[in-house]
Amino acid sequence: TSSAILKNEPSNRTSSIIAVNLNIDKRDSIIKPKRGYIVSLTSKYAGLGGNREYSKSTGKGRIYFPLITDSIVVSSEIEAGALSMNNGTSTASERFYLGGRTLRGFQYGGVGPRDLTVNESLGGTNYTVGRAEVSFPLGLPKELNMYGGVFGELGKVWGLDATVPPGTNVNLDDSIRSS
């Protein structure tokens, strides 16, 4: 069964979206960067047509630098997003989810607001993620091009603007999760 919150969402939704992207890539290599940074900003506006009206923005920045030698590389990243409804409440497809590829160590949708009645992820109107990684040679022949890595990630999803029906047990825990 599905969450009562999700069942109460409007079934007939249409939207027209205009988006603006800004990407800056100053890495020394797109395959195995050792130095530089990459920044990506996206802003979307829905409301030029249809019955949905909202603004949704995301941003991500990652920096790379060598540690001790050029073969040991540290990368650090921060990512965030916000959804703002201009009228009505957000739907599941408009909200943010973390887990899987977006926060390693958690299943997709495993972080953030959740309907405990049916154990279903509801997503949130805001999210933030921080990542750090160190890659290093394994001492194998260079031709194999194999590296080891150690990473750490933390993130959270918060903000649920949906109406919660009586009898629905929602966990709005917005704790920072890490792996």
Label each PLM-derived region with a short phrase.
Residues 1-8:
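Transmembrane beta-barrel wall of Gram-negative outer-membrane proteins
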